[in-house]
Structure formats: structure tokens, C-alpha cells
């Protein structure tokens, strides 16, 4: 009888332990993920009226949508999401006219969250603040205007500038036509004059690349041959040549917001018309955005001494065992140490705006860039929070690695895209 009683008690205790264990595991799985410190990178898009900035914006958001096989996507607030969707609908519908350009009153800032997809829940890796300026504002340069003062301030505080060149006008310039010369030497020069006031990376994008042909290139010329000819022609313009020589990072990127089989140019009227049976297939539109963070961090890294980099790398594993909140709070004391002071000096030399500890933490993680042997790393963590935190860091590293690969592919396929580095 006593044996049966003891057995019954042990059975009950075992059931209790099992139930409690399940509840603990359930609570752990339901525990919210730690949040990544998310810095914001500031981008200003410039271009004359009719250059294609508005269509580029719609195509850009489309290209960074969530899609199978890619571990990240761009998101924004619901109102902007609906507006960009409507804008894209007007672009792709052959029965609809092209969207009108951004008016001076329509200049606005778009906030795009780069969301990484991990098993537990999506999390924001970083944010892009994208300012789309109206092309007509360049007509006011030299005048006294509050909007211009704001534009100058934003340009000087930007992490990257995207200068949109109208591919149709560039083609006219390559053909030696008067309208093309006036566009490149006068209108583009005004935009370049503004860009010269900034010290950040510059991305000159040749929009409407599907229309850039028939300017004397061989019949079988590929994108590299055409881009090389475009680059050499643009470098004959003094303002552009001076801009490139004075910058450490200037890229020339051919893009088509709609693709090569979507629209045609009516040579008699100069109008770009949609094909009734056109295929919407954007080309390279995501590359100017993908290059921003790798280029920025590479510039900071190149200005640092190797001893500082080794110190940061040596401290990497210890930092990975801290939560995101702990990392951000400890950055202040790190920046007072020799390695931290050197890093801060390098960042200050590249960024010309205030920045928070979130950016420093992301920069530290990028410099260390572990081999990411996930199983070994995850097994070394003693707590669930440490493992989940590592997964967040790793998810963001995957995004930056993908961006870097896109930049490498661009440089390999189109060496002429690198004007200055």
C-alpha cells in the first residue's frame, strides 16, 4: 500500500513538473523579441523636372517588396503604402498617362523601414529617410527662398545624394544635339553645383536607360560599352569632372524604372509612350539604395587604423552576449576609450550630422563581421535572450551582406559605374 502511495505521489509530481515545464517554454516562446537599435540613414534625391524621379520612387518601393527567397523587404506607413501603390498602378497601366512630376509643394520625406524576416517575427534592421525634391526648385537657385535654405541644409546633412539624370536628354547630348548640350551643361550643372556642397557619397543615376541608344555606339554594344561612352562624355563637362575629382565615392548607375520592353520614344514628338503590350521589368533601381550603407561604412573603415579594427574585432564575442539595450547604453563609455575615440573621429570625418549610439552599434557589428558559424555561436550562449539577440544581429548582417553582393556584381558587370572611390 505504501509503495502504491509513493508511486502515485511521484506520478503526480512528474505531471506537475511536466505541465510547469511546458508553461515555462510557452512563456519563453511568447516573450517578445529584443529590439534592434535602428539607425536612420538620410538620402536626398535630386533631379530636374521630367528626369524620372517620380516613376523611380514607385519602382523602387516595388522592387524592395516582400518576396520569396529574400530575407528582407521595405515597409512604410499605411498611407504612404497606399499612395505608392496607386502611383505604381498609374505607371504600369498602359492606358494611364505617366504620373505628373513632383511639384514644389509636393516635396516630401518618405520613411522606409528595412524589415528583416526571421522565424519569430519581422524586425526593423534600419530605416531610410528618403527626401524627394521637386525638380522645379532648381530654377530658384540664386534666389532668396526658405525652401532653398531647407534644401541646402538637407543636402549638407545627407548620408547619400541620388542625382537623377534624364536618359533621353543624355542621349541627345551624346548625339551632339543642342537640347542635350543645354540640359547637361546648364540644367545638370545647377544640380551638380548643389551636390558640391555636400561631402557624402553621390549616386548619379542615368534614368530611362532603355532609351539610351542610337548615339553612335556599335550595333552590338552591351550595357558596359554604352555606360563607358556615357561616363566619358559626362566627364568632359567641367562641373561633373570637378565633382568626381573632389569626392571619394561617386557612382554612375544606369537604371530603368520600367524595363527595356515597356516604353518607346516617339522621335517625332520627343514623347515617351507606353507599349500596349509592354512588360514591366525594372532594371537596377534598387542599386543606389543598396550601395548606401556599405559605401558609408567602407569609408569609415578605410579611415581607421588597423589596431583600432583589431580591438573592435577582439571585443566582438563579448558584445554579442549583451542585449541590444545594454549595447546601446554602453557605447558612451566605449567612445571614451582609445579605440572608441578613434572610431568616433572616423565617423565624424565622414558623417556631417548628429548621430546616435544606434549607428555606432551597427558600425561596430559591421566592422567585426563574424564568420557566422551559427550552430557554434548559438551553442555558446547560455540564455534564451542571448540566442535571440544573436539571431537579430545575424538577420541584419544578412541584409548588409546582400547589399554588398549587389554592389560587387554591379562593379564586375559595369566597371564604368565607378567614377570615384
Give, region by region, the residue ranges found by the protein language model.
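Non-catalytic alpha-helical scaffolds
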Residues: 1-130, 138-156, 251, 262-421
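Active-site micro-motifs of SAM-dependent methyltransferase domains
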Residues: 62, 135, 211
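MIDAS-like acidic motif and immediate structural context at the N-terminus
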Residues: 132-134, 166
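A short acidic, glycine/proline-enriched capping/turn motif at secondary-structure boundaries
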Residues: 135-137, 170
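Conserved GTP-binding G-domain of TRAFAC-class P-loop NTPases and closely related GTPase folds
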Residues: 157-319
